[in-house]
Amino acid sequence: MSRSLEGKFAIITGGSRGIGEAIAHNLASKGCSLLLNYTSDSSRTRTESLCNTLSTTHKITCIPVQADLSDPAPAVNTIISAAKTHFTSPTTNTLTIDILINNAGVSKDRFLNDPSSGPIDPAYFNWHYTINVLAPLLLTQACAEYLPRKPAHSGRIINISSISSSLGFTGQSVYGGTKAALEAMTRTWARELADVATVNAVNPGPVVGDMYFATGEEFWKQMQGFQDNTPLSKLVDGEEAVEELLSEEQKRLIREKMGGRRPAFTREIAGVVGMLCTEDGAWCTGSVVCANGGLKFT
């Protein structure tokens, strides 16, 4: 793969697993050095191992930084401080943050007056909005002064949104609202930061992972109509990615319980993000780029 991001530096929140981990692999393969943010002690070993692998494989610098974005102000300070410590140029004594990926997020469905979880309350609302909206806002604001000044608009900010921002899934009054807010901020930042960066969002749909396969048949049934209408979701036996990334049990569940329609692989989402981070994405800003196999068209 072309090292089109050689010498660049990116911050990825929620970079230890899932889509964030896949983005880390993609950017590292392009020569980009990384700061991977993670939240809990349970992710420390995993993130350190990931950084070691990426550093060795791709000859880049990758550091793990623990910071809990549910308390965003000190978390942002921790991330920026670590970036200054490890990525300040020894020749110019300045820090340049070329790429920011606002990927970290939380989601827990709850219906209005939910019979099992109780009504939506301020604590539930604030938990979602603090991590999914306030944290990326504060981190983007903090990174703004370190975005590259030359060439013009050469910085990249990518916000990881969701199809939930606009499709009205039941139980997602709050989560869907946070992703709609993130997309609104994307458009605002595209104008405010136009001189130094492009700003876009990417909106995945269902993604392969342990959590998706654990959601169960009720959720899969809710998604079936959407998946049936997703042009790229048909499970194709023998396809390289299918054979590499899905277990036989997962393939069985897709055939028998999901109508033969698979979720995305995380690296498919990461590929779209990676493109937006390169020079090939230079004329795209303020957009919500669909990375969901056609589940939702722009």
Swiss-Prot record:
Inducing or repressing factors: Transcription is repressed by D-glucose and induced by D-xylose and L-arabinose.
Pathway(s) served: Carbohydrate degradation; L-arabinose degradation via L-arabinitol; D-xylulose 5-phosphate from L-arabinose (fungal route): step 3/5
Catalytic activity: xylitol + NADP(+) = L-xylulose + NADPH + H(+)
GO biological process per UniProt: fatty acid biosynthetic process; L-arabinose catabolic process to xylulose 5-phosphate; secondary metabolite biosynthetic process
EC identifiers of the protein: 1.1.1.10
Active-site residues, as the UniProt record annotates them: 161-162, 175, 179
Domain of life (superkingdom): Eukaryota
Binding site for NADP(+): 19, 68, 103, 175, 179, 207
Keywords, alphabetical: Arabinose catabolism, Carbohydrate metabolism, NADP, Oxidoreductase
Entries under InterPro entries matching the protein: NAD(P)-bd_dom_sf, Sc_DH/Rdtase_CS, SDR_fam
Effects seen without this gene: Reduces slightly growth rate on L-arabinose and abolishes L-xylulose reductase activity.
Function recorded in the entry: L-xylulose reductase involved in the catabolism of L-arabinose through an oxidoreductive pathway. Catalyzes the NADPH-dependent reduction of L-xylulose.
Protein name: L-xylulose reductase
Gene name, Swiss-Prot/TrEMBL: lxrA
